């Protein structure tokens, strides 16, 4: 049994190198897996399931081809693609999961998430997240003409880049106390997440129990894949061609 986890690809027409690496991964690696979990930020920005640009359609086709061949695909929304929803899933065969989802791997309960909710020291981001996740606001946004949404998102992207330059690295990382709280709340000793772009495996003690936190990498300069097989977790790099 092989299960794969990826996140933070930030797919965009402006980065064909990332897209090519992703397509190669889907067609030559994911095809041999039992399941594929995408833990958010698949896209640089997703402005709605009605955006059928040639680029978006090409990515959807990769997922559709994979699910039609029997590979189960699951998706957790990230901070860049939280508007990806039911229509995308219907068109691709992907199953949308809750922000915090507990899965079972060979009898062990494992919590999976995007990871942005763990960065509670970044107060301004958490306030922004709470606003944009309001159902009524998303309902209104999805009914704005597509070309206007594209302009809005472009402005938001520019502001995000400006703010990131002024934030310290520790603020953009997870808060350890929140990690422990969430893991205890969900009753797990293993957590897998993305968002921070810092691939690593962390072990620590909490309430006299050994906990493990696995962080997925981003795809900015190379692909990053977590493979689970024979009860072993392995983080792999995938070089761009």
Swiss-Prot record:
GO terms for MF: manganese ion binding; UDP-2,3-diacylglucosamine hydrolase activity
Pfam families in the record: Metallophos (PF00149)
Known EC number: 3.6.1.54
InterPro entries registered for this protein in UniProt: Calcineurin-like_PHP_ApaH (IPR004843), LpxH-like (IPR043461), Metallo-depent_PP-like (IPR029052), UDP-diacylglucosamine_Hdrlase (IPR010138)
Upper lineage: Bacteria, Pseudomonadati, Pseudomonadota, Gammaproteobacteria, Vibrionales
Residue numbers binding Mn(2+) 1: 8, 10, 41, 197
Record GO biological process: lipid A biosynthetic process
Xref: CDD domains: MPP_YbbF-LpxH (cd07398)
Record keywords: Cell inner membrane, Cell membrane, Hydrolase, Lipid A biosynthesis, Lipid biosynthesis, Lipid metabolism, Manganese, Membrane, Metal-binding
Sites where the protein binds substrate: 79-80, 122, 164, 167, 195
Topology class, membrane: Peripheral membrane protein
GO CC aspect terms: cytoplasm; extrinsic component of plasma membrane
Cofactor note: Binds 2 Mn(2+) ions per subunit in a binuclear metal center.
Protein name in the entry: UDP-2,3-diacylglucosamine hydrolase
């Amino acid at each position: 049994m092989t299960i794969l986890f990826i996140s933070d690809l930030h797919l965009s027409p402006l980065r064909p190198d990332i897209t090519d690496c992703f397509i190669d991964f889907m067609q030559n690696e994911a095809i041999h897996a039992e399941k594929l979990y995408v833990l958010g930020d698949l896209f640089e920005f997703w402005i709605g399931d009605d955006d059928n640009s040639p680029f978006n359609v090409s990515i959807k086709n990769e997922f559709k081809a994979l699910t039609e061949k029997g590979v189960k695909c699951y998706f957790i929304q990230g901070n860049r693609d939280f508007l990806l929803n039911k229509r995308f899933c219907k068109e691709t065969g992907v199953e949308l999961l809750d922000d915090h989802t507990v899965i079972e791997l060979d009898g062990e309960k494992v919590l999976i998430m995007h990871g942005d909710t763990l960065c509670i020291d970044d107060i301004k981001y958490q306030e922004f997240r709470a606003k944009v996740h309001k159902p009524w606001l998303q309902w209104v946004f999805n009914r704005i003409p597509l070309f206007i949404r594209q302009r809005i998102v472009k402005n938001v992207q520019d502001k995000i880049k400006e703010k990131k330059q002024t934030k310290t690295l520790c603020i953009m990382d997870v808060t350890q106390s929140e990690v422990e709280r969430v893991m205890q709340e969900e009753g797990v000793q293993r957590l897998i997440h993305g968002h921070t772009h810092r691939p690593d495996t962390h072990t620590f003690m909490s309430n006299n129990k050994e906990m493990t936190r696995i962080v997925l990498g981003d795809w900015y300069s190379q692909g990053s894949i977590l493979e689970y097989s024979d009860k072993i977790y392995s983080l792999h790099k995938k070089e761009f061609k």
